């Protein structure tokens, strides 16, 4: 993932900062992980994975 792109991308729901981990962009506040496919972030809520509380604590 391009570092410059990561600096300008925000969560589409809360506009918070995202973390890049293992082909996903993660919003800790909303507990959502947005997939990155072929280096293209998919920033759609319906495509995001809900992060379980146990996993959120490890981020």
From Swiss-Prot:
Query: GO CC: one term?
Result: cytosol
Could you tell me which InterPro entries the record lists for this protein? Trm112-like
* Gene3D superfamilies xref list: 2.20.25.10
Q: Name one Pfam family in it.
A: Trm112p
Top-rank taxon, per record: Bacteria
Q: Which PANTHER family match?
A: PROTEIN PREY, MITOCHONDRIAL (PTHR33505:SF4), ZGC:162634 (PTHR33505)
Q: What family, per the record?
A: Belongs to the UPF0434 family.
Q: What is this protein called?
A: UPF0434 protein lpl1884
Native species of this protein?
A: Legionella pneumophila (strain Lens)
